Amino acid sequence: MNIILFGPPGAGKGTQAQSIVKKHNYFQLSTGNLLRDEVKSKTELGADIEKLISNGKFVSDEIVNTLLRQSLTNLKYRDRIIFDGYPRNVEQATNLEIILKEFNQTIGHTIFLNVSRDIIEKRIMGRMTCEKCNMTLNEYFNKEEIELHPCGVEHLKKRNDDNLDIIISRYDTYMSSTKPVLDFYSKNSNFTEIDGAGEIDQITNKINEILKV
């Protein structure tokens, strides 16, 4: 069964997608990667995509649909895909259903990792990275680990590029544009909303339970 996993920036989609890939032998399909791979392949379509991107223009749904169809012809992907970053709107969601139907496939589960903006802010702005061992901790969620960090607290530094205004803007834009998609999928019995504010392992366990059904 194919899976759609979506949620706002900072919700932990990438972490959970990788967990599903490893544990359940799935393939993570990102439209961004599809576009980049097509450009690298030096095809005529890839050249068109590169031109659009370099000119700051959006790649049309028609092109994305073509790449999705190409991927679905690969039998190793059959009913083993995690759709990452797609669909982003209702038209894309409708297109995806049509394309999957062409290949006698469906979406088995749609999982939404819901995380409040407050938690996202703390996750991003509270990040501290050890300049010696590169371990990443969070001053809001890992207070005890920070105090006991073997390299010493003095080596934990915050990143300069964690810009709160950018994070807030991305979050608000995502939630606004995704609301219609949520409404589209939430009517289905295979839709599950998970509180993405919990511990990573707890969220992973919830997803694993869902995939057993």
Predicted regions mapped to residue ranges:
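Glycine-rich phosphate-binding loop of ATP-dependent small-molecule kinases
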Residues: M1-V213
